[in-house]
């Protein structure tokens, strides 16, 4: 039995493994390991979690005592051990452990669970080895560390503790690299470009620029190309997306300006993928990318239309074809990215264009017509998705401002239908979104709200909603007060908007409100 095997057997006999912060307990375990255990022998005989635990205990013990003497070439063994530990904890199917065959790949969740189980111990080992032996990690090991640093724990293989250790370790390693932009360029060229080479969409050329004459996509191509040969980043190396996300978050505008062609194929491949988690991650990354990407390059290269065409299909990922929860995740991310794109497509400085013909104006109009209104027609019975659409509508209107008046004929009926629904109190989140959406309509389109037809429909919607909310006061519980305040605020905004037209609208609204209050005194609380 080898030294490490003996140590592993001792670890396996433990009922529980102590927390990583319990240094004294770890040193106690380390003290019980065989005296002849060395880094060289550990490197030769590594094994899964028990091996990582034994290694961690060994390192914590040797870190606090000088009884174990390491040979002069221990640093080389430590470097080799770092690479081996990184391979073990990486969120990749483990061919060495016999998990992968040509026709049988483990599920993504299975790989993520295994990596999540091993990562806390492996990352702790890497941190100790790097500190004790002043190791500069090789790029592949660094990629594994990066894959555990995603913000918001968006990857299922990382935890809060693992993320903290990985970020700390990464920060230390980056201090040893004189030019971080060189590392980013190396990752983009030598790691990400080969991984995504076969899954590049037809909309861009191999150099990442807009294709002037793109080939028509085969509708069946997506299924045929969804393989490990075409998408190794999806099936063979789950680090790739997390690493790309880190590159986008880390790169400054100068790096993006110089290396942008290397980003585009990866972004479009993610946006084109049919798996919800990947497409959504691509949308989140695109939003971060656009935030820093120079507007002039976006405009002059034609990439704005490429991104628009890549994201827009996601707006139609709706039930019943797409599960409701998946649809919500995708819609929120897609609208956020498209709104960011609209803000970045302002006309050139000094160039005055009518709103309807400007790139930003056309995109916002398209978002409402082909996005919100089209989707609402199909998903009225899915109240959670309706809430998302209403919240995004408010954001779009705030971007359009007065130019949103052209859409009043669709905006007012959509909001009125939700507010007037007798069962609206059953979905308070959707009701709240409709009220806030109507506030955005009033705030941006107030000059046209003196039109009697619009005014009557809005008053009716507010009155019906106010009565419903008060009738269902007990059912709404804590949400009642919030909804009541927002409804009163909306009615007040409508009154102010009517006064702002400097016409007969204000008097008409006051007369209508007084008549309603005379018939139902409860409405005095609405029209204060």
Predicted features and spans:
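Residue-level signature of the C-terminal ends
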Residues: 32, 36, 58-66, 88, ...
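Alpha-helical repeat/alpha-solenoid scaffolds of the HEAT/ARM/MIF4G superfamily
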Residues: 90-128, 132-244, 298-306, 310-330, ...
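HEAT-repeat alpha-solenoid elements in large eukaryotic scaffold proteins
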Residues: 4-11, 47-66, 114-129, 160-170, ...
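Short coil/turn segments at helix-helix junctions and helix-capping linkers
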Residues: 42-46, 109-117, 153-161, 227-236, ...
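Glycine-rich flexible loop motifs, especially short His-Gly-Gly/GGXG/HXGH segments used as catalytic or interaction
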Residues: 2-46, 50, 76, 143-157, ...
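Core helices of alpha-solenoid repeat scaffolds
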Residues: 4, 22-33, 74-82, 135-146, ...
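Non-catalytic protein-protein interaction scaffold segments in large eukaryotic complex-forming proteins
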Residues: 12-149
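Intrinsically disordered terminal tails
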Residues: 1-16, 22-33, 37, 74, ...
